Amino acid sequence: MAALLRSARWLLRAGAAPRLPLSLRLLPGGPGRLHAASYLPAARAGPVAGGLLSPARLYAIAAKEKDIQEESTFSSRKISNQFDWALMRLDLSVRRTGRIPKKLLQKVFNDTCRSGGLGGSHALLLLRSCGSLLPELKLEERTEFAHRIWDTLQKLGAVYDVSHYNALLKVYLQNEYKFSPTDFLAKMEEANIQPNRVTYQRLIASYCNVGDIEGASKILGFMKTKDLPVTEAVFSALVTGHARAGDMENAENILTVMRDAGIEPGPDTYLALLNAYAEKGDIDHVKQTLEKVEKSELHLMDRDLLQIIFSFSKAGYPQYVSEILEKVTCERRYIPDAMNLILLLVTEKLEDVALQILLACPVSKEDGPSVFGSFFLQHCVTMNTPVEKLTDYCKKLKEVQMHSFPLQFTLHCALLANKTDLAKALMKAVKEEGFPIRPHYFWPLLVGRRKEKNVQGIIEILKGMQELGVHPDQETYTDYVIPCFDSVNSARAILQENGCLSDSDMFSQAGLRSEAANGNLDFVLSFLKSNTLPISLQSIRSSLLLGFRRSMNINLWSEITELLYKDGRYCQEPRGPTEAVGYFLYNLIDSMSDSEVQAKEEHLRQYFHQLEKMNVKIPENIYRGIRNLLESYHVPELIKDAHLLVESKNLDFQKTVQLTSSELESTLETLKAENQPIRDVLKQLILVLCSEENMQKALELKAKYESDMVTGGYAALINLCCRHDKVEDALNLKEEFDRLDSSAVLDTGKYVGLVRVLAKHGKLQDAINILKEMKEKDVLIKDTTALSFFHMLNGAALRGEIETVKQLHEAIVTLGLAEPSTNISFPLVTVHLEKGDLSTALEVAIDCYEKYKVLPRIHDVLCKLVEKGETDLIQKAMDFVSQEQGEMVMLYDLFFAFLQTGNYKEAKKIIETPGIRARSARLQWFCDRCVANNQVETLEKLVELTQKLFECDRDQMYYNLLKLYKINGDWQRADAVWNKIQEENVIPREKTLRLLAEILREGNQEVPFDVPELWYEDEKHSLNSSSASTTEPDFQKDILIACRLNQKKGAYDIFLNAKEQNIVFNAETYSNLIKLLMSEDYFTQAMEVKAFAETHIKGFTLNDAANSRLIITQVRRDYLKEAVTTLKTVLDQQQTPSRLAVTRVIQALAMKGDVENIEVVQKMLNGLEDSIGLSKMVFINNIALAQIKNNNIDAAIENIENMLTSENKVIEPQYFGLAYLFRKVIEEQLEPAVEKISIMAERLANQFAIYKPVTDFFLQLVDAGKVDDARALLQRCGAIAEQTPILLLFLLRNSRKQGKASTVKSVLELIPELNEKEEAYNSLMKSYVSEKDVTSAKALYEHLTAKNTKLDDLFLKRYASLLKYAGEPVPFIEPPESFEFYAQQLRKLRENSS
């Protein structure tokens, strides 16, 4: 063995290098390439151990089979989405807990199988999940699961390659599964799958796990003949092999052999040696080795120490566990690792050791109720731990305050697992502690017996309830007991006979609900007549509705309804029998489908007529609801029959007289000649000239008719002059604007344009004065405003204007015109970095944090400091960051700075700091920088150093590395990544596999895996490439890098240089550059590039995304005419614009009052609305808004009314949403329009029973803070309160928004009956929790509990999280699962009930 290893010394050194020589990498079976056999279509091979599958079924596959099984585009897309979803679910579980629950893996497996088509990634994902990620399963169960997955996916068409075999090997190793490595190799060769380095490494490990050194030597010999490098993983396996063969001396000597071969033993090798000592119970050698490691530069993580603990425990030496636990540093990643070890120990029946580790976990016990031990207790229940042990564990967990209610939780687990005997024993223990036992505790036990109709089992559980002093409630009887018997009477008799009927009245009411739901209306009528107890119609309504639908006896329908209407026992609500029965009829019809109503039309007609003869009446507003339902069900003939029940049949109301308005004259000259007002027409003409960029003519027109100019015309002219860089003209126009109306306000974009041009021309004080005016006049600040300020400041910074940057920034922030964000504070540091003044740059960055809590450009400052060796300043920066933002942030800042500057040794020390964990956003940020700057070595080091970083997404890291290799055309390095992915057992996403395959193909290399098919055609292939008159790769590469770095000016300068030298890039480069430049500051340059590309590349066009961005930019710059033209061009090219782009155009036209162009856009998009995802209401709302803007309010209202009341409706009334129109009218303070809209909405409600508009208007009033107006509207139109679905949807949407608790509360105060709705008080609690309003949340909870309202788990979970956040005790047992779990549970419950 030693000779084999030493002879491979030169190869080991080669393997340790970042890149092997090309000659070595092309050797057959080398680390980078596979044998020619592996290039054949991969066989659908089965597991190779133990003859799991027959050879015929394992290896039969033909190349043409792939053609037969080709999938459609839609199917491929579905499979891709399916894999992404599965990966996301499993990845999330691993990141959060370090493990995968069996149920989740089973669900992903089942869903994947149901999808019908499978790629290699699906199989790889599922196989790799069957090892150590399943600590809750026994080892043999894990392997069995893996084999089942292999068999099933093979039948479904999965194609296996070497990565799948390697994954199966990994599972075998993790599960200690015994198999024949030689048979495994033979099966692979039969399947035309060539083993690679990873395969051989894992086969060696399999021999070593059973102490077979001879077998390992054979595999090592194979590796030598194939010139494969022997890595540390092989040496670590050999340590284990010698130890398990009883040869500890040679196990220790492996470390010496490693050093002789040029490899220094790493943490993995020492861990193998430590585990070997632990398996022998040799605590002394373990301690000595740990001390040796501590003195070296190596670092063993807590998870490594936990593995040593497991080795001691499993080998029968639990007495040494405490000594190893003392050495645990409790890194942040420790908890999930410890939890997984605890689960594994319980699985191995080592519960006492598991408890010892659990009690040693560093869990805070001062943050309110704790449930940390829940996972341990639940798994103990699953593994059938004796009840005596369980109660003892619960007692210990409670004593140390690690779990606030361990017994109750364990009981909960036993009930869910249907472990009856354990549950009963635990209930007794819970009761002995003084806690009440509720009826619903027994439901999980009853449900199984109900399914089996096990009467004796039901009786035993009911007796058990009596023993514990628990009486069944109505739900228990209705849902679980009565369904087991032939009838309610037989159930009563048998229960009485067995002494299980403790509350006869409770059972009677439950029996009524049960028989009603089953359609036994004879029983219901008889019961209601003879009953002496008051029963609320509300309590039996849902059961009665089911019964009515299941019985066709109209006489019974009528008699029961009459009894409910006339008997005071059943209609005790304040609203009286008329309204109660009215709502019952409405709910009856609403609960039916349209086909059911049509089938029962005659029965319903008879029902209505019989009720009319019985003098049963319903309110008018409820009749209207019924009428709308009947219309939507296409049975209008029933409306007249339902109308018979209305209390007052006078449904005619006086129509409100509509007002009229004058029409505008056609031309300015005609108006002037007739000596009539011309202001409106003059303004419109100014606006048109501005849109055409005709500045000279617009200014001439202004001078000619100056006395008739209005503020809107001046505003447009100011903006035009700013665009043309005419600073003096803009200032003069602004002065005239102020003289005309000192209170007038420009819109935000025009103010920003004016500030920008003033700052650019050095008029700093004028610019600051404009900023002050923006504040004084309370100008609306948009999202784009802060970005515009940044560009203005950054331009000054690059020019080195320190005082300009400082004063403008201070003015903007002090006046509150922009948040002092990191982005807007960048120029403050940039101006000093440009001058090389690092000390001042750091001081300014620190000053920004002290003032604004942002730290701009700290990475760039640190890199400069590291490069200059400014240790004092580095220490100062790090001390500050650590103190203010925490040690984790400081470590990442320093890590990235060291990486960026090539100080990899220091970077390694940082990333190995105990407790550090992956911050995905920060890692991705640095990866993007490396890719954009083409920093290959830096990114490679990042990927290498983060290999063992907790929660690091290794696939994403390798994907970033491959992106860089793709740019550089480096297939050799990309090929090495494929081996590393397998070595690390990483599950590659489809995008990673596609990218790797693309790189290999571009290098004329074979692809050694099945490539997932694309469901779409990549945009870049649709761009027409052009052969340049002169090719200059450096220019093109530079411009692409500048684009990735978001360096607009730099990219544009490269374009100009290339243009001067007559260099033409390909179409894709120009598209990227145009998209980059398409911002407010560089729009002109973007159009210049576009024009150049169009004249130099035949057929050049922007793609859908770029054109959509162009449209949005044109709208933002108020180039509406150009935006409409661009939209037309996009559609002519058969492209699909984004919904956002189209919506922005329409909304901007509406704000200008441009009805004509909105209609033009509508015609252009005719038939394309669905593909864009554009609602017809976008046009309806904005055309109406445009008409209102033109003071043509009556026309807007008339159009809306016609659409809602005509027979041929464009949109059904219930979907006719006018909320946008109402909101804009209210925001713009268009009072005449608000008044007329209110009249229209009320008229539609009162005359036509169309309540959607008035309800939308009511809600918009509330949302705008006009609560008194909303209250008055509600008093005039009470039907608003009955539009429950609309109201609840509004509450739900607002509960998701920050700062909307007052809005939600206002709606509930105005409509108190909504408070009874579960969705309503859930929304209110959600709002309180988001705003951390503990006092209001407490009041809500106390109010609901006082009314005995049944609160769902999601409500309680939210409330509990708020109390814990505030450091207050939780007055109930907090639901143990996640928010997502309870939200999904509630969603399913509602879907089932509907």
From Swiss-Prot:
Residues with the modification Phosphothreonine, per the entry, are: T1136
PPR-type repeats, residues: 126-160, 161-195, 196-230, 231-265, 266-300, 301-335, 403-437, 438-472, 678-709, 710-746, 747-784, 785-820, 821-856, 954-988, 1031-1065, 1066-1102, 1103-1137, 1138-1175, 1176-1210, 1317-1351
The subcellular localization recorded is: Mitochondrion; Nucleus; Nucleus, Nucleoplasm; Nucleus inner membrane
> What does UniProt give as GO cellular component?
condensed nuclear chromosome; cytoskeleton; membrane; microtubule; mitochondrial matrix; mitochondrial nucleoid; mitochondrion; nuclear inner membrane
Tissue expression pattern: Expressed ubiquitously. Expression is highest in heart, skeletal muscle, kidney and liver, intermediate in brain, non-mucosal colon, spleen and placenta, and lowest in small intestine, thymus, lung and peripheral blood leukocytes.
Transit peptide residues? Answer: 1-59
Tell me yes or no: is Ribonucleoprotein among this UniProt entry's keywords. Answer: no
Q: Which PROSITE patterns match?
A: PPR
Keywords of the record: Acetylation, Autophagy, Disease variant, DNA-binding, Leigh syndrome, Membrane, Mitochondrion, mRNA transport, Nucleus, Phosphoprotein, Primary mitochondrial disease, Repeat, RNA-binding, Transcription, Transcription regulation, Transit peptide, Transport
Q: Where is this region: RNA-binding?
A: 1121-1394
Please, one GO biological process term? negative regulation of mitochondrial RNA catabolic process
Q: Which domain of life is it from?
A: Eukaryota
Region annotation (Interaction with BECN1 and Aedes aegypti venom allergen-1) maps to: 712-1067
Q: Does the keyword rRNA processing apply?
A: no
Recorded hits in InterPro entries, A to Z, give:
LRP130, Pentatricopeptide_rpt, PROP1-like_PPR_dom, TPR-like_helical_dom_sf
Could you describe the subunit structure of this protein? Component of mRNP complexes associated with HNRPA1. Component of the complex, at least composed of LRPPRC, BECN1 and BCL2; the interactions prevent BECN1 from forming an autophagy-inducing complex with PIK3C3. Interacts with CECR2, HEBP2, MAP1S and UXT. Interacts with PPARGC1A. Interacts with FOXO1. Interacts (via N-terminus) with EIF4E; the interaction promotes association of EIF4E with 4ESE-containing mRNAs. Interacts with exportin XPO1/CRM1; interacts both alone and in complex with EIF4E and 4ESE-containing mRNAs to form an EIF4E-dependent mRNA export complex.
State its role: May play a role in RNA metabolism in both nuclei and mitochondria. In the nucleus binds to HNRPA1-associated poly(A) mRNAs and is part of nmRNP complexes at late stages of mRNA maturation which are possibly associated with nuclear mRNA export. Positively modulates nuclear export of mRNAs containing the EIF4E sensitivity element (4ESE) by binding simultaneously to both EIF4E and the 4ESE and acting as a platform for assembly for the RNA export complex. Also binds to exportin XPO1/CRM1 to engage the nuclear pore and traffic the bound mRNAs to the cytoplasm.
Recorded hits in NCBIfam families, A to Z, give: PPR
Q: What is this protein called?
A: Leucine-rich PPR motif-containing protein, mitochondrial
Q: Which organism is it from?
A: Homo sapiens (Human)
Q: In the UniProt record, what gene is named as encoding this protein? A: LRPPRC
